[in-house]
Amino acid sequence: MKVRKARHFILIVLMTAITAASVPCTASYADTGSSFEYKYYKDPEMYGRALQRSMAGVYDDFNGRTFDDKTIPIPGLVETCIRTEGEDSTSKQYVPQGLCRADHYLLVTAYDVRKKHNSVIYVVDMNGMELVSTLTMPNKFHAGGIAFDGENIWMTGETSDKYKGDPFVQYLPYETFLSHLDEPVSEVKEPELSRYIYIKNKPSFLEYDEGVLWVGTYAGRKNTKDSYMYGYDIIGEPGNRRLNTLMYSIIAGLDSSAQGADIAGDYLYVSSSYNSTSRLKTSFITKYNLKSSQTGTGDYLVEGHETNRVEVPKMNEEIIVDDSTVYINFESGASYWRLALMNTDRVLAVDLSLWGRRR
């Protein structure tokens, strides 16, 4: 009897250990490291019909103005594979956030809404239109912003309400980034990142343009123009970059719900969104004339210099303006937002001409 009890106890311990252990990535995603498929709508026609039912006005504007050959599934919505301390695990709870282009790679950031797993960067090779790796970061940051300056990949730091320290950003050297792409799942260690680079405003989203890292701050109040961006010059030698935070430029007058921005020539494009279920118009990409909004101090006040405002599907996040295309990332495809008015499970590629002909 005692022997049976001992064996039973050992069995319970073993089962508990197995349950607690990391679950390896699903076999079907062994090559990509995370899912890379459309979660809700398997083809553009299905997505179009859903958009027409939920947001008819947006459908009318977008119909015939999206590029199906440039649109990609948002990685990791079905399953994200994570590697922490050498152990692989999976999650279905990741929420997409940031978006940027680094050479021919498209980078999409995401965080685990339950804060159980570390944040990730999905890496998509736009030449082959395939997911090549999922990089697990050494933190659980919201990962709201990412930008590439040609040498380093910049990322937003801690932004949670619990964090009481100074705001900061970090970067990952591009050469280090490339070294992680040989594996479908890879783990970025803390020493591979730069030190914390402290700045003057909360880093909600990022944009790089002509030697300046623009850091946007989400204000979150409806129907106001309280969001803004600070532009910090990137200085220092390669491998030891820092930001000049003593002197910085300001872009003010953005929608308070700003989620992302991109500068293209003389124009600023701002992605703003609030409210996931309302049928009111709450999600936009707005084009501003930067040149005409410059003040006597060299800063910019874009309020009053709006040239085009286009309603887009709900819960838009960071954007890229690239040649003739606007790429839009969304968080509404995440399981956490399954009750959203419209679940967009793709990085939409939209014709830039929707915002007027000139960049």
Each language-model region and where it sits:
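Sequence/structural signature of beta-propeller modules
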Residues: 7-14, 22-87, 346-359
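Beta-strand-rich domains and repeat architectures in extracellular enzymes and scaffolds
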Residues: 74-117
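Surface loop/turn motifs at the tips and blade-to-blade linkers of beta-strand repeat domains
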Residues: 87-91, 134-139, 194-199, 249-254, ...
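Structural signature of eukaryotic scaffold interfaces centered on beta-propeller domains
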Residues: 89-102, 144-149, 153-154, 160, ...
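Residue position within the beta-strands of beta-propeller blades
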Residues: 108-109, 155, 215, 270, ...
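Structural motif
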Residues: 115-122, 161-177, 221-233, 277-290, ...
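Asp-box/WD-like beta-propeller blade repeats and closely related beta-sheet repeat scaffolds
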Residues: 175-210
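Loop/turn-rich, solvent-exposed surfaces of beta-rich toroidal or solenoidal domains
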Residues: 250-300, 317
